[in-house]
Amino acid sequence: MEHIGIDLGASRSAICVVSSGGEVMLERTIRTGEVERFLGKRPTSRVAIESCAESRLIAIRAREQAHDVRVVPTVFVRSLGIGTRRIKTDKRDAKNLAIASFRLGDELPHIHIRSDESAALQDLVRARSSLVSQRTMAINFVRAQLRKALLGRGPRRSAKTFCAGVRELLGEDTPLEVNAHLATIDVLNEQIEGLEKKMKVVAEASEPATRLRKITGVGPIVSLAFLAAIADPTRFASGSHLASYIGLSPGESTTGGKVRRTGIVAAGQKQLRALLVQAAHSMLNARRTREPMAEWAVELERRRGRKVAVCALARRLAIVMWAMLRDGTRYDPTMTRPRERQDPSEQLARAIAAAPGQSRCLAG
């Protein structure tokens, strides 16, 4: 089998073909729009592509032509030799990808290739997140201007009513630059509201999202963001694997045989992690609908503090939601109750009761 390394670009892409024996057969630079035609003329090969904006569509088209495709995440490409020694060209990158595919085979690190439906859902979630970030920047600018005028941080209101509060505070003396940002915030509020309405419609039409929304604190935005990020739940071997993917796994600093746990690694899906933390806050604050998970988090909060409890609850929420998608089950609060730790003496007593014939050996 041949190994084809492709360094995709917005207009032109570099291609390198390595034979099954590891020899470079072909190196070429073509227009990105011609990559699909080029792959159609090659025999069934393994295609290695660095993750980028164009990689998903090229990977899907290559799979349709019976190629074995590996989209390599950007965080791993440097370990494959790309960009080392401060020399980085498209031609060298394509060659390193092809050689890495030949040497590593099935061990070549790669990411999940999303379907069209999953990609569209992810684009919807990211569009809202992008607008929310822009709105936050505009609000922070206005608050900074208010502080310069010795007016404090401004009105403590939601983003939707923030502009009205600022206009009431400043009246006709509102500076031009502040007015410009307030107008921007008004426009962003309308656009965000429109996207959230669409997300609500999509969530109501989605059976998995409807099941996830039965969890306290999980609404249309959180459920769709989770579905968009996970895509295929079977690609995670365990709940710990999922938590690591989201960045909710605890870090570790071990030296001299002494294990020390640190804070969460905070890697991977930043947007989803933030939404899960918000959902955990909502569950903890929902006093009327206290659930076993929330009770466990409240007990943890007494011992370790609010932040640790919220992160731990967000991690548990993610694992429960993943298990529901994997098994196709509905939410049952009683199934999320943590297992109670048994006293060692009680465990021994149960073992003796379960095996009467061995009681003397256990007692002795």
How would you label these PLM feature ranges?
Residues M1-G171, P250-E252, N285:
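Phosphate- and other anionic-substrate recognition elements at nucleic-acid/protein interfaces
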Residues R56, T74, R92-K95, S118, ...:
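Non-catalytic, well-ordered alpha-helical scaffold segments
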Residues I87, R114, G152, R156, ...:
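Conserved phosphate/pyrophosphate-binding and hydrolysis machinery centered on Walker-type P-loop NTPases
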Residues G105-P109, A138-I139, I192-L195, A231-R235, ...:
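Short helix-capping/linker segments at secondary-structure and domain boundaries
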Residues H112-A119, N179, S238-Y245, R288-E299, ...:
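Short alpha-helical "patches" and their helix-cap loops
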Residues D123-R211, A314, M335-E340, L348:
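Glycine-rich, often acidic, oxyanion-interacting loops/wings at catalytic, nucleic-acid
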Residues R211-K214, P220-I221, A225-R306:
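Phosphate-backbone recognition surface of nucleic-acid-processing proteins
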Residues G257, R261, W296-G364:
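Low-complexity, acidic/Ser/Thr- and charged residue-rich accessory regions of DNA metabolism proteins
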